[in-house]
């Protein structure tokens, strides 16, 4: 996988202020504020910074937590995980493997088959609709 490196100025020119805050400074959007929280269309979710494919709509579920939730990533996603002890909590941060964008966090309270909940900021992803079948 090709790594993507840009300066802070380049990211600021490419992203809107909320996308930059969330993805480049490890911010968190307010619960229930993101455009994909209740989104149910068929397709894929990719990194808003570099278009790396991350999640399929078939793994999205309604968790009630206020952020888009997935029980698994695409087989090819290779999402990076690292410990996060900010804000007095112990969590696992999720990062795009191609550009190191902050995506959200992973928790062990999700549904089968994984038992995991990928809690993702809407500002860190964009949706690509599944093409209509002929």
Model-based region annotation:
Residues 2-134:
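A short Gly-Trp-Pro
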């Amino acid at each position: 996988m090709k790594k993507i490196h840009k300066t802070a100025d380049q990211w600021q020119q490419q992203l809107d202020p909320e996308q930059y805050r969330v993805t480049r400074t490890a911010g968190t959007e307010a619960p229930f504020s993101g455009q994909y929280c209740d989104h149910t269309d068929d397709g894929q979710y990719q990194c808003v910074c570099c278009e790396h494919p991350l999640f399929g709509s078939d793994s999205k579920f309604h968790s009630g937590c206020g952020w888009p939730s997935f029980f698994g990533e695409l087989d090819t996603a290779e999402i990076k995980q690292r410990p996060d002890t900010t804000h007095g909590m112990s969590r696992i941060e999720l990062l795009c493997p191609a550009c190191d964008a902050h995506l959200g966090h992973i928790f062990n309270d999700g549904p089968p088959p994984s038992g995991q909940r990928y809690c993702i900021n809407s500002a860190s992803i964009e949706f690509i609709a599944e093409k209509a079948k002929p």
